[in-house]
């Protein structure tokens, strides 16, 4: 096995060498699109709402989003809820609606719970987009998807199959139980697993939630090892979770291995195909590209 990192360039996400379109686009030149975006962004205020503070994954995209909008003459306010919950995001949205923003771009903590507040924003004339984790289609005008749900799930299932040697117990360490993107990936993983005999010797023993908090993710990793003595692989489709699990497994010399979605900068010391490293390989797309594409999409609404 070798380390594999997934990369996306603006309008596509690459999964195991396959380019998957994530947003329809016309054939205009980059210069034309930039000029159009610049005209529409001039003097506009845009709010970017994250799932929670302290997530380096989102911060990379947020920085790219902000730089792109500001380069086109707009202003960005990046806002984080107090906790990674829908209720906390609703409080943030309630405050933003009263501040005369032209647009809101959000990574949602729940598929349906934000609908009333986001519909209120749109009724007030605020443009609403989303990226990374989508609210339902009635809650926004467009969603910029970093990669296809099935493609992400397929890559993760194949990694579990590979790292486990094709059989044995594995578990999933996710973000929050309401997280739209993680839940979609996990559901797709289960569907893929049930529909193909090559996964028949794998057993998904548990799905646990670290709420994208390092300590809780560490505690959940420890609990998995305690509860499942024969656990061979943990799959963490969350950058916070995978980093916490990688450190715990490696520090404790666990034979259980890890894969999932992680940031190279956070996973470098834990990644290697040998007994000394907890994670043989992991995946991720280009968060800077995702932030830039989301910015241009939002200011074009």
Residue ranges and their predicted role:
Residues 2-5, 9, 14, 23-301:
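A residue-level marker of the well-folded mature domains of exported/periplasmic proteins
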